[in-house]
């Protein structure tokens, strides 16, 4: 079992509750205090005469609202006339993913059940600070995480990078146009799972683009990242890295060469997604 992990959630498909934000409490208290002060002032102080009406000034035009759906997908011409329910979609998804990456890679690496829900939950979690590992559609990478200590400094051991090479090889070999064509054909299933996850009225393809863009912003490191181990799990010593999203931490963890290959494929997929939504 690795010592580097992200918090796991036994209910991966339920949208996590929003964390408590103390600034919201401060703002709420401030608003309440202002309301009470206004209430008592109107009762205890005489009402001043109304000021003369100001000359009419044309209000500045409101900025254009952002479109509700930023990356709409047109229905594929070869889309199935009817799609299975989410509960019955695993057979179709297994066939589609297996054809895309190969039967052996699928058997070795992919969790073969609740695939649509797992993919959607993982995509939604990647730009967040943490991701539920039990929701991910891939099996855990074999082997344990290794760190190297030199004096008082601990860093990622570069031997870790080799563990991810088989997974990265599969990603690098994916036919991006075929991947996006399959995604568009089955898109209603992904949308349904996203709404079920707790985002009714939100568009899953927009969230996918956000996740890809976030991954592409992962910084490139010149040397293995320094680590701290305040408790059981390792953390990045650099606060900027530790504050990064779950998806960016994955790319930082797999090493610069692996990350570069994954980013190259992400750029290809992004271009295909933009083309599928009528943009270039």
Regions from the PLM with identified roles:
Residues 1-18:
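N-terminal, positively charged topogenic segments adjacent to a membrane insertion site
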Residues 17-27:
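N-terminal Sec-pathway targeting helices
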Residues 25-37:
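Hydrophobic membrane-insertion alpha-helices, especially the h-region
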Residues 34, 223-280:
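A cross-kingdom marker for long, charged
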Residues 34, 46-151:
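N-terminal Sec/ER secretory leader and immediately downstream segment
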Residues 92-106, 160-173, 242-248:
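Acidic/histidine-rich, surface-exposed loop or edge segments in extracytoplasmic proteins
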Residues 109-112, 130-138, 178-183, 194-208, ...:
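Surface-exposed patches in mature extracellular/periplasmic domains of secreted proteins
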Residues 144-206:
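Mid-length scaffold segments of soluble, non-membrane domains
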């Amino acid at each position: 079992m690795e010592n580097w992990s992200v918090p796991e959630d036994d209910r991966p498909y339920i949208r996590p509750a929003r964390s408590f934000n103390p600034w919201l409490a401060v703002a709420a208290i401030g608003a309440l205090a202002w309301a009470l002060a206004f209430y008592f002032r109107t009762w205890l102080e005489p009402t001043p005469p109304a000021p003369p009406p100001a000359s009419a000034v044309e209000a500045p035009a409101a900025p254009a609202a952002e479109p509700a759906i930023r990356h709409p997908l047109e229905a594929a011409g070869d889309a199935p006339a009817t799609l299975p329910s989410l509960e019955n979609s695993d057979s179709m998804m297994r066939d589609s993913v297996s054809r895309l990456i190969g039967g052996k890679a699928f058997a070795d690496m992919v969790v073969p059940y609740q695939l649509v829900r797992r993919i959607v939950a993982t995509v939604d979690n990647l730009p967040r600070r943490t991701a539920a590992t039990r929701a991910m559609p891939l099996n855990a990478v074999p082997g344990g995480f290794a760190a190297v200590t030199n004096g008082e400094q601990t860093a990622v051991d570069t031997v870790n990078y080799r563990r991810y090479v088989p997974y990265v090889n599969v990603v690098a070999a994916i036919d991006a146009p075929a991947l996006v064509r399959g995604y568009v054909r089955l898109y209603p299933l992904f949308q349904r799972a996203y709404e079920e996850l707790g985002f009714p009225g939100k568009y899953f393809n927009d969230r996918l683009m956000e996740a890809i863009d976030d991954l592409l912003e992962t910084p490139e490191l010149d040397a293995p990242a320094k680590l701290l181990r305040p408790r059981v799990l390792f953390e990045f010593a650099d606060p900027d890295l530790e504050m990064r999203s779950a998806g960016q931490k994955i790319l930082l963890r797999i090493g610069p060469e692996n990350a570069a290959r994954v980013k190259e494929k992400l750029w290809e997929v992004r271009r295909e997604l933009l083309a599928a939504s009528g943009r270039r």
